Regions:
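Membrane-embedded transmembrane helical bundles of large multi-pass transporters/channels
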Residues: 1-39, 107, 123, 131-383, ...
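Structured non-transmembrane domains adjacent to transmembrane bundles in polytopic membrane proteins
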Residues: 49-72, 81-165, 380-570, 580, ...
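A short glycine/threonine-centered beta-strand motif
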Residues: 77-79
Length: 725
């Protein structure tokens, strides 16, 4: 592999105009596709096979007039100060508003609050339920704007009108918050390299890679139904790894130039050595992300595949476009004011490794205890999906949620739809009455409506209003309690009972995600162990790496719970809303952090193994690995952290939590696990860290991530050239 990459890099260096033109053409073609072929993305999160989804499918077949699965909106109306909605003038304004909403595009029905009796006890707040003809995925931005515009007259009269529900959510914009991360990355690169050219190359290649990846995702959205969150992970990861992979290769290129090689040979050697590690690191990230498809949750699979494709593009650009750009830059990457080597003074990484080696036991204990302490909040982690309650405080969804909660209780924001299948019941109406009576006696039930039957009389709908909000544990328990009534009802009346609605759907999704987390974690840990055993030809090194990865994961879970669930440091971080942790976050974090953790493991430990194999003492090899790799790994980690942390400034709490989790995870894994625990354990074990049974040594393939085959190839070429001369 190393020799192949060496030849690819030299070809790209020589034919730089061709390679640069080819990548420019790819970017332009996909950019054109994104502009002309992209489709509408949706916010819906569904999991085939869940009870709530099965109930929706049943309603679509037996009760089409119920419009199950179609978009809904809740309109919250508050009268001006000193007025009541029961006043004739106020009533006329509200009825005019309802009439305007009925004529809005896509609206199928509006429940008049006076007829539906959805006016608060004090007469100040009303709620109008709006049903659409199409699912939320098909509600356009123009439809949403038309709905909001219908309230202009009422607002002019002094009424407060806000909108909530899945019809209002729209597609979250991927804001320019990543620009903060790019600026910090530029500063870190400039300090690391001491050259504007060297600092600019990783940024340029990363931005091109992200452009190609995002354009590809947008183009695909015209042919495949994608969730609106699909591009977010691809954007975050594409930018971060794109900078990192180029950083490793540019750093090695500068080293090869310093060794006296001409630029073309230096580019070949840099890609042949550092590029091999980039290939392996990228492959681990891709495998972890594609592995999200086995979880059985469509949105996670989409996010994983899109991000994996963007990472693959970042690898390809680092191996082909970057050496072409090095051909244009030549020796300019060194810079006129590059810092000379400091004679006699050890590098920062070497000094740190020696310190950890001398104090390995207290350092190891301190780091492990610190991880465990930070992980403590994870014991109380609650999972959920974004609702109007977690929307930005100044958004109309959040304001509508607060108004409805104020007027009718939080549960009104998340009604449960109970479906009663009476096809096998001798007396369907008696069965429905029995169901509503038993449900009304359950704890946390605020109200139960009368059963509404379809035209055939074999399926009925009952709306249950919980006392608690959609994301509360009490509501989750209520859904379980209603479902527990099904067997008893079936035995007594022959009817079957199921629960659906947006709240029940979210509960089912969260439970499925929580159940998938441990199997996916097991898959990732097993994969990590096998991959690292192949690369480092050791049992202890992979075991240490995977245990360190688990430590990073649980510590990050703890930090996320402390901030986004408990509300610690929210003012400092600019987090506007707290509540249950997004259900998808743990699995996403496991997949992404695994790939990034393996990046740092490979870049640091590869040099240790290389020196140990060539005869260095095991503990000296640890110092050597840090001497050559720590500076670049620190820069790479700071760049990753800055890119991810930039998303904490996003408007949506979902994006904020992803950005914070990834930034904190990289911080812990890079600086606590890889830079502290790894050298401490390696120094403690010495040569025993590299133990591998002979039979396993023979059975494992040799991937040569250290580039030993390239060194032999270059030595043979030099010997042949010497013999000819």
């Amino acid at each position: 592999v190393a020799t192949l990459l060496y030849r690819l890099a030299r070809f790209s260096f020589r034919r730089r105009w061709l390679v640069a033109s080819a990548w420019t053409a790819v970017l332009l073609v996909l950019g054109g596709g994104a502009l002309t072929l992209s489709g509408q993305m949706s916010n819906s999160v569904t999991i085939p096979g869940t009870e709530a989804q099965q109930a929706i499918d049943h309603l679509k077949e037996k009760f089409p007039q119920a419009a199950a699965g179609n978009a809904t909106a809740r309109v919250a109306i508050e009268a001006p100060d000193g007025q009541a909605l029961t006043d004739p003038a106020a009533r006329a304004t509200v009825e005019d508003l309802v009439g305007r909403i009925k004529t809005a595009p896509g609206v199928a029905m509006v429940a008049d609050p006076y007829q539906a009796k959805t006016i608060s006890a004090d007469g100040r707040i009303a709620m109008a339920q709006v049903s659409y003809k199409v699912p939320a995925t098909d509600v356009t931005d123009n439809d949403r704007e038309a709905l909001k515009s219908a309230a202009d007259a009422a607002k002019s009269a002094g009424f407060t009108v806000e909108f909530g529900g899945d019809a209002i959510q729209g597609v979250p914009a991927t804001e320019a918050t990543e620009g903060i991360g790019v600026i910090v990355a530029a500063v870190v690169l400039a300090i690391t390299f001491g050259s504007i050219v060297a600092a600019g190359l990783p940024l340029l290649t990363a931005l091109i890679g992200v452009g190609v990846g995002m354009a590809g995702v947008m183009t695909v959205s015209g042919y495949v139904d994608l969730n609106s969150n699909t591009p977010i992970l691809a954007l975050m990861l594409g930018l971060a790894v794109g900078i990192d992979y180029a950083l490793f290769i540019v750093s090695r290129y500068r080293h090869e130039l310093a060794e006296g090689h001409d630029p073309e040979l230096a580019a070949g050697r840099a890609v042949g050595t550092a590029g091999s590690a980039v290939v392996f690191a990228g492959l681990t990230v891709i495998i972890a992300l594609v592995g999200l498809t086995v979880v059985g949750i469509p949105i996670l699979g989409q996010m994983g595949v899109a991000a994996a494709a963007t990472v693959a593009i970042a690898v390809l650009i680092a191996l082909s476009l970057l050496p072409a750009l090095l051909g244009f830059a030549g020796r300019k990457v060194v810079g006129k004011h590059a810092r000379p080597k400091q004679n006699g003074k050890p590098a920062m990484g070497e000094r740190w490794a020696r310190y950890v080696g001398r104090h390995r036991v207290p350092v190891l204990v301190t780091a492990v205890v610190g991880l465990l302490v930070v992980a403590i909040p994870a014991l109380s982690m609650q999972l959920g999906l974004p609702t109007d309650a977690t929307a930005a405080p100044d958004s109309t969804q959040r304001k509508a949620y607060n108004l409805i909660s104020k007027g009718f209780g939080e549960g009104t924001n998340g009604p449960l739809i109970v479906v009663i299948d009476s096809a096998n019941a001798p007396d369907p109406r008696a069965a429905a009455t029995e169901a509503t009576d038993s449900i009304s006696r359950l704890p946390d039930v605020a109200a139960v409506t009368q059963a509404q039957f379809n035209t055939d009389g074999d399926t009925a709908l009952v709306t249950v209003i919980p006392k608690s909000g959609p994301s509360s544990e009490a509501t989750e328990q209520l859904v379980a309690s209603i479902r527990d009534q099904s067997d008893r009802l079936s035995g007594a009346t022959g009817a079957k009972l199921s629960v659906t609605g947006q709240t029940a759907l979210q509960i089912d999704v969260s439970e499925k995600l929580a159940g998938a987390m441990l199997p996916y974690l097991g898959l990732i840990v097993g994969l990590a162990f096998l991959l690292l055993m192949v690369v480092f030809r050791s049992i202890i090194v992979p075991l240490k790496a995977t245990l360190g990865f688990l430590g990073s994961v649980v510590a990050t879970f703890g930090a996320v719970v402390a901030v986004f669930q408990w509300g610690w440091l929210t003012d400092l971080l600019g987090v506007d809303s707290t509540g249950p942790i997004m259900s998808m976050l743990p699995i996403l974090l496991i997949g992404v952090l695994f790939g990034l953790a393996m990046d740092y493991q490979v870049f640091l430990v590869t040099r240790m193994r290389e020196d140990y194999v060539h005869g260095a003492d095991a503990r000296d090899a640890v110092v050597s690995g840090f001497k050559h790799g720590a500076r670049v790994v620190v820069a790479a980690a700071l760049i990753m952290i800055s890119v991810f942390a930039g998303f904490i400034a996003a408007e949506l709490s979902l994006i904020q939590s992803i950005g914070f989790a990834l930034a904190f995870g990289v911080l812990v894994d890079a600086f606590v696990v890889r830079m502290t625990i790894v050298p401490a354990v390696m120094s403690l074990l010495g040569k025993h860290a590299w133990w591998l049974p002979k039979w396993l040594h023979r059975a494992l393939p040799n991937v040569d991530v250290e580039g030993e085959s390239l060194a032999r190839h270059l030595n043979q070429r030099r010997e042949l050239e010497g013999a000819r001369s």
